[in-house]
Structures are given as C-alpha cells and as structure tokens.
From Swiss-Prot:
The keyword Glycosyltransferase does not apply. It comes from Geobacillus genomosp. 3. One of its GO terms (biological process) is catabolic process. NAD(+) binds at residues 12-15, 158-166, 276. Keywords: Aromatic hydrocarbons catabolism, NAD, Oxidoreductase. The gene is nahO. The keyword Transferase does not apply. This is Acetaldehyde dehydrogenase. Its EC number is 1.2.1.10.
C-alpha cells in the first residue's frame, strides 16, 4: 500500500518556493514530484533542481501530463487559478488554492478543514484570512459576532508581484471569509504594505463587536485557538492580552474585543519577517497532509 501521495506545486515564486522547503523539511505523506512555473530563469525552479525536485517551466501543462500527481498546490495568482481550476478538476486532481480566487470552499485548518477533505478544490483565502479568521471564529463560537474588522500590516519586501496583483481580491475574499468562516454578520478587511527597513513582522489588528458574550469564555476560546494554530505556525502569537470595551460600531453600540496579533515566519526559505507568506504555506501543507492521508485511507479500503 502506498504511504505517500504524489503532489506538485504550480508557481515557482516566493510562496511556491517556501512551500517546497516546508514539504521537503518534514516528509510524511506528501511526495513532492514536481514544481512547475513559467519562467525558465526562475530562482524557485533553480532551487528545486538543487534539492533534487523535478522543475519545469512548462506550467500547468507539465503537471497535467503526469497522471500520478494527485494533489496540486496552486501558488500562482487569482486570475490564473480561475483558468487552472477547471483543467485540474477534469484531470481528477485535487487543487489546493493559495490564491484569493475562491473557486472552492474557504478552508482554515483549525476551523473547518475536516468538513472539506473530500472536495476537489479548496481555497486558503488569504494570508490575512488565515491569520485573523481563527480569532473571529473563536469569539463567534461563544458569542454572537455582529461585526469583525481586520487590518493586516505586512512588510513591503514580502509582497511579491502575485500579492500586489491580488490586492482587490485580498480585501474581498478576506472580508467574505470573516463572515462565512469566522461567523461575523459583517466583515471588513484592510491590508497595508509597510516599506520599513529592517522589515517588520506581520501584524494584525482584529476588532470584533459582539452580543451575548462572556469575557471569560471569550478569553478562554481565543487562548485555545492560539494554541491550535501554533501547532503548524509556531510564530503565531498575541502581542498582549485581549482588550475588552464597549463602543459605537457600524452595528450600533456593542461590546468589543480588540486583539493585536503577530506572525513570525519559520524562516524555511523566506525571512522570518514574511509571516504573511509563511502562514499561507504552513496552512497549505497542513491541508495537503490531511487530504493526502484521506486519499491513502481510501486506497487501502478500496
């Protein structure tokens, strides 16, 4: 019985390269067979070859030519994934989408991964979504969240061409994620690229307005969620205790909790300041491993 599942990474930029190192760093059920880009001179492809991974500038066509690849991590762009999704589905390959395209259902590992392990396309929302939606969900499972707002500040140096092309998709998809997964009646997302040098760590301010909530229960739920995310993103942490207040909000005067979150990257390929990219690749690996394990179990019982 096969104990691994062959996977490929589509996109050889910062995110694709960091994901490659994460998969190679701890080999379990994912067998990285290929990394495919479109630029023959890509640093990511050169690094893949140096690690003994088959690298090609043939893009999605190269991946589709290999029937043994069962899972594809798409680390390109939202517009590109809209084209890739249909072709991957037709080829019977599971797509784990690291762009804001949102063709498949939104997935945040500690919140709803197990609900979607059987889907042929899952979407990891955005870096800001992976960072802040768990906290909004932590409040919504013990209170009625009327409004959630997040401001994500990331180092400008960590935002490559793909990130910059996806700014509009980022705000829309993250806002929807705060609602659909986080449980807020209304969500709002803002991203800021900070050019400071040395680069700052990813910082997120999360503002949650709620009804029918107990401070102690909310604090406990948030603490448990922080612990859950740290299992795959060790650098995920609050900068201080939750701040409770009562304020005027877009939904009227309500109780609010304000959270200051910092994400430090693991430094597998990207600098530790690129926590915004690290949380995406760590989440992708987590999702890929769970889906791969299910595929193995299905094969063993067939």
């Amino acid at each position: 019985m096969n104990r691994t599942v062959k996977v490929a990474i589509l996109g050889s930029g910062n995110i694709g390269t960091d994901l490659m190192y994460k998969i190679l760093k701890k080999r379990w059920v994912l067998e990285l067979s290929m990394i495919a880009g479109i630029d023959p001179q890509s640093e990511g492809l050169a690094r893949a070859r140096a690690e003994g991974v088959y690298a090609t500038a043939g893009g999605i066509d190269a991946i589709l030519e290999d029937p043994e690849i069962k899972i594809v991590f798409d680390a390109t762009s939202a517009k590109a994934h809209l084209k890739h999704a249909k072709r991957l589905k037709e080829a019977g390959k599971v797509a784990i989408d690291l762009t804001p395209a949102a063709v498949g259902p939104y997935v945040v590992p500690p919140v709803n991964l197990m609900e979607h392990v059987d889907k042929d396309n899952v979407n990891l929302i955005t870096c800001g979504g992976q960072a802040t939606i768990p906290l909004v969900y932590a409040v919504s499972r013990v209170a009625n969240v009327k409004y959630a707002e997040m401001v994500s500040t990331v180092s400008s140096s960590s935002a490559g061409p793909g990130t910059r092309q996806n700014i509009d998709e980022f705000t829309f998809t993250t806002s929807r994620g705060l609602e659909v997964i986080g449980g807020a009646e209304k969500g709002k997302a803002i991203i800021i690229l900070n050019p400071a040098k040395p680069p700052i760590l990813m910082r997120n301010t999360v503002y949650i307005a709620y009804e029918d909530g107990d401070d102690h229960q909310i604090r406990h739920s948030i603490g448990q969620m922080i612990h859950d995310v740290q299992q795959y993103v060790p650098g995920y942490r609050l900068k201080g205790e939750p701040i409770f207040d009562r304020r005027e909000t877009p939904k009227g005067r309500l109780d609010v909790v304000i959270l200051l979150l910092e994400v430090e990257g693991a430094g597998d390929f990207l600098p530790v300041s690129a926590g915004n990219l690290d949380i995406m690749t760590a989440s992708a690996k987590q999702v890929g491993e769970v889906i791969a394990k299910r595929l193995i179990e299905m094969t063993s019982t067939a």
